[in-house]
Amino acid sequence: SLYNNGKFKKTKNILDLGTKELRVSFDQMEYAFKQTKIKFKKQNFKTLKKFPKGKRISTKFFWKELGISDYNCSDINKKSKMYIDLNFPLKNKSLMNKFDLVTDFGNNEHVFNVGQAYKNMYQLCKKNGYMWIFQAVYGGNGFFNYDMSFFEGMAAANNLSVLYSCYLVQTS
């Protein structure tokens, strides 16, 4: 895993693009922690025992267990603590080059101006930081679907490296 390979060792802060929640069962979360050899603190995730029903849990608690304590999330909702409309260039220049890790877990396919959305994502990320992108290849619920060549091309055009790339297939 990227965690076991030390990729997040220096990661102190994160920005989730879009408000994110854990959408896995308690058993799946426990298994994921075993894979990374991180102690699973059951009390922090007990709400997941009711998944998919019950209260949802912010990803903030997952990142904290990985040692990333400065959690931030943005949303287009004007009530959001960090309002960012990814369709347009970043207005708040103090956010540029601020985050060690910026995630797109099913957010940027909802933005019409895809090029600007990923440019903003890049600008939010610190030098030598990470952009973690997890997108549906087909179906999904946004305006766009991407394939690997989109992300490989984006990386090549901007002199970035792809650390890990894969397709995940859900069978259940």
Where are these regions (language model features)?
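A short, conserved alpha-helix within the catalytic core of class I
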Residues: 110-121
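N-terminal accessory regions of S-adenosyl-L-methionine
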Residues: 1-76, 163, 171-172
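Conserved beta-strand signature within the Rossmann-like core of class I S-adenosyl-L-methionine
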Residues: 128-137
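Hydrophobic adenine-recognition pocket in adenosine-nucleotide-binding enzymes
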Residues: 104-110
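A short acidic, Gly/Pro-enriched loop at the edge of an enzyme's catalytic core
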Residues: 84-102
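Conserved Class I S-adenosyl-L-methionine
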Residues: 142-168
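Short "lid" loop at the C-terminus of a central beta-strand within the Rossmann-like core
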Residues: 20-21, 136-140, 168-170
